[in-house]
Amino acid sequence: GAVFPVPEIQQAAFLPYILPLCRPSFLVLTGHDRADGTSSLHTQAFCRSVRAARLYEPDPERLVIFAGACSSRAEDILKAGANFASSPGRIPISVLDPVLLALAASAVSPGRRIEPSRIIAATLCGPAGIAAAPN
């Protein structure tokens, strides 16, 4: 897989150019976020990025998306179209959690359904740090 370090607020603009070139089956959109009262600093940027990725591939089975960071509003990111999001408990997640999630999801055989609870169990923070879209 390819890694492109793009600031959170620029990810949505970057995706239309890079997704057709890479044609990923799994996309990780992360960075930094922090709770600021009732909102989070970059949650809306992650939501815009998820919507941009869904314009490229609307099928959540063909493009699995993880988005968010520490203290992100997972419910907003899931509504935007992500399969997985952080952080439902508004906790700091491990820097390894997006990687562990991607590894666990990529280990699922093609044509088999990803079981969200099994994928989330593979992360360090578990359900307090990672949420899955409802089936």
Functional labels for PLM-detected ranges:
Residues 29-43:
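Glycine-rich phosphate-binding "P-loop"
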Residues 89-135:
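C-terminal functional extensions of proteins
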Residues 48-93:
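Catalytic cores of nucleophile-dependent amide-cleaving enzymes
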Residues 11-15, 73:
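Short acidic active-site motifs
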Residues 1-5, 28, 84-87:
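Short hydrophobic alpha-helical runs that function as membrane-insertion/retention elements
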Residues 13-14, 45, 49:
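Well-ordered alpha-helical segments embedded in enzymatic catalytic cores
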Residues 1-6, 14-15, 19:
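Metallocofactor- and cofactor-centric catalytic cores in central/energy metabolism, strongly enriched
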Residues 19-29, 82:
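Proline-aspartate-enriched helix->loop->beta-strand connector
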